[in-house]
Curated annotation (Swiss-Prot):
Binding site for Fe cation 1: E64, E94, H97, E178
Organism: Pseudomonas putida (strain ATCC 700007 / DSM 6899 / JCM 31910 / BCRC 17059 / LMG 24140 / F1)
Keywords: Cell membrane, Iron, Membrane, Metal-binding, Monooxygenase, Oxidoreductase, Ubiquinone biosynthesis
Family stated for the protein in its record: Belongs to the COQ7 family.
Record-level Gene Ontology MF annotations: 3-demethoxyubiquinol 3-hydroxylase activity; metal ion binding
Gene that this polypeptide is encoded by: coq7
This protein's name: 3-demethoxyubiquinol 3-hydroxylase
Positions contributing to Fe cation 2 binding: E94, E146, E178, H181
Length: 215
């Protein structure tokens, strides 16, 4: 039977640095799951439509950068091994979302947000602090964050042009995955944050969405 490898604190820091670089640099590999957009038809979009869709996908890409950082920060400070594993598994699934969003952004002749390093650092710190408080709070933060992401995805799905089936397929699959992450976190014992905390999180999310839509 294979034994589980135990990493030293230095090993974990180096792994975190590697993950940060792979998250923030242009994606060059292949996601574990192919993009849902692959099977959808190409359609002609006018310049205004393409620019708006690219802005929405840029927001979603930055949201996935934040989620990746949040999970990595929590995994670094999680107290229970099973919680750390859950965070790392969720982070792996977010890599697919990162790749899908970036691929779609490039197809629209645009680029990811230049603010991604800033939001990665902020989210990593928040995740690490949540993990230091308790695993229950850490898991609750995951659930609250993912529910906020689902809300944004619903709004973006309503804004997409009907003919853009590629972006729609990506966002619909992302929403399924994010909802599952939220429910899994609560089932694992995550704390249900009160309304004032969720409201504060929504204000922070608005700062991210407003700033990354264009840059």
């Amino acid at each position: 039977m294979a034994t589980e490898r135990h990493y030293s604190p230095l090993d974990r820091l180096l792994l975190q640095a590697d993950t940060a670089m792979r998250t923030l640099l242009p994606f060059s590999g292949q996601p574990a799951r192919p993009s849902p957009a692959i099977v959808q038809p190409d359609v002609d979009l006018d310049e205004q439509q393409a620019r708006h869709i690219a802005g929405l996908m840029r927001i979603n890409h930055t949201g996935e950068v934040c989620a990746q950082a949040l999970y990595q920060g929590q995994a670094l400070t999680a107290k229970l091994p099973e919680v750390r594993k859950a965070m790392e598994h969720a982070a792996e699934e977010e890599v697919d979302h990162l790749a899908w969003c970036e691929q779609r952004i490039r197809q629209l002749n645009s680029h990811p947000s230049v603010l991604n390093p800033l939001f990665y650092g902020m989210s990593f710190g928040i995740g690490a602090l949540a993990g230091l408080v308790s695993d229950k709070v850490s898991l609750g933060f995951v659930a609250a964050t993912e529910h906020q992401v689902c809300k944004h995805l619903d709004e973006h799905l309503e804004q997409l042009p009907h003919e853009d089936e590629k972006s729609r397929a990506i966002l619909e699959q992302m929403r399924i995955d994010e909802e599952q992450h939220a429910e899994s976190a609560l089932e694992a014992g995550g704390y249900r944050f009160p309304a004032p905390v969720r409201f504060g999180m929504s204000l922070l999310a608005k700062v991210m969405t407003k700033s990354t839509y264009r840059i």
